[in-house]
């Protein structure tokens, strides 16, 4: 067992609750001790929605431990069924309450006798899966449940829609810029003359799941959520799916060409090449910007990328292929899908890191000293400590990455947003230098940022003054090189002589 003060992907029950609370009129009952029930607070704080989070905690306390949980859990399910009239109630334990080894499936069967809506137990192993895997499995389970139910009743649609249509699978609550991506994907589909049949799970009704087979194909924009469902629909109903994430000019074009291929295979005659050309050359600013002098200033600059599989792979490709930036390290915390990630990014970066240990990533960033980091909220903290700018490109994220303004990452507008984020993340050296020289408005003294948060070396007055004369955008590097030299030679105080010796040693 490992103590972690930062987790990139949460425990399994968070994934299940994300799916349940994404659907319309679905309620979740969480069988958990106090302390595991933070999902309501987290979602209410982060998602900018007016509705309450439809999750109730059935608390495991000493009375429950003494008498067993059945009575309390069944009562809570039946009570919520009467109060809220949900279409579906999903019961989920947490990793803590799983220790009790109770027969929750039996509780669900018992509650179903008295409940008017459907009741389901989330079928997830809480010790084997994390938040992302559990979300994928829960979505698959709900879709399968309702399609099988419709099949028994003979309610499945027998024909496809007349016009080409798509199901967008994987848009969920608490996802990284998911709502914005959904809007952009709907626009993209409209531009291509494709109707959106269903978007699941966000805002979907479980009663509409029976309509999923009407679509011509499925689009899975995020690798973490939706692949299991798309695989099931392909196996049962012969529905093809596109799992190319449309992020960046190149990948968006590849995604559209794959859609064209699937639609034409079903009898339509579409040609999207003119649309791709028009968008790439004239509508999206990213292709033009990447050839401008501003972007050429970034050529060869070093960057580190870290995040979930989808976003880390997409950003790595954009940096290397479309902007000429040198990616020294690309990493993901999705260890369960590491082979796919390696295959996607290995030709675009020097080093691949598969880890969910934030200290390992922090150490790698400190060792590589990139000009910018593109990562999660945690890499932002690391960047602040090391004085390296960071653009946030993947979950886990905090409130500032749930923007009110329109900021998609997918599609052609997404490429503009990503390009802005990348360019603005690199510190413009001259700007930094001028601020230091002139001190800005009403600044009494120049503020110097220390790089080492816990440096064990002392700088004497003369050496500190000399260090302050070094331009801000290289000062961090000079300080780190000098301290490294001092440690290797056994100096505890850094003087001017030590500084000059260090400078000679690194050949600067």
Curated annotation (Swiss-Prot):
InterPro entries: ChlB/BchB/BchZ, LI-POR_suB-like_C, Nase/OxRdtase_comp1, P-CP_red_C, Protochl_reductB, Protochlorophyllide_Rdtase. Its EC number is 1.3.7.7. SUPFAM superfamilies: Helical backbone' metal receptor. The keyword ATP-binding applies. Transmembrane segments: none annotated. Keywords: 4Fe-4S, ATP-binding, Chlorophyll biosynthesis, Iron, Iron-sulfur, Metal-binding, Nucleotide-binding, Oxidoreductase, Photosynthesis. It is an enzyme of class 1 (oxidoreductase). Binds 1 [4Fe-4S] cluster per heterodimer. The cluster is bound at the heterodimer interface by residues from both subunits. The active site is at residue 294. [4Fe-4S] cluster binds at residue 36. Its cofactor is [4Fe-4S] cluster. Pathway: Porphyrin-containing compound metabolism; chlorophyll biosynthesis (light-independent). One of its GO terms (molecular function) is oxidoreductase activity, acting on iron-sulfur proteins as donors. It catalyses: chlorophyllide a + oxidized 2[4Fe-4S]-[ferredoxin] + 2 ADP + 2 phosphate = protochlorophyllide a + reduced 2[4Fe-4S]-[ferredoxin] + 2 ATP + 2 H2O. Substrate binds at residues 429-430. Component of the dark-operative protochlorophyllide reductase (DPOR) that uses Mg-ATP and reduced ferredoxin to reduce ring D of protochlorophyllide (Pchlide) to form chlorophyllide a (Chlide). This reaction is light-independent. The NB-protein (ChlN-ChlB) is the catalytic component of the complex. Protochlorophyllide reductase is composed of three subunits; ChlL, ChlN and ChlB. Forms a heterotetramer of two ChlB and two ChlN subunits. PANTHER family: LIGHT-INDEPENDENT PROTOCHLOROPHYLLIDE REDUCTASE SUBUNIT B. Belongs to the ChlB/BchB/BchZ family. This is Light-independent protochlorophyllide reductase subunit B. It comes from Rippkaea orientalis (strain PCC 8801 / RF-1).
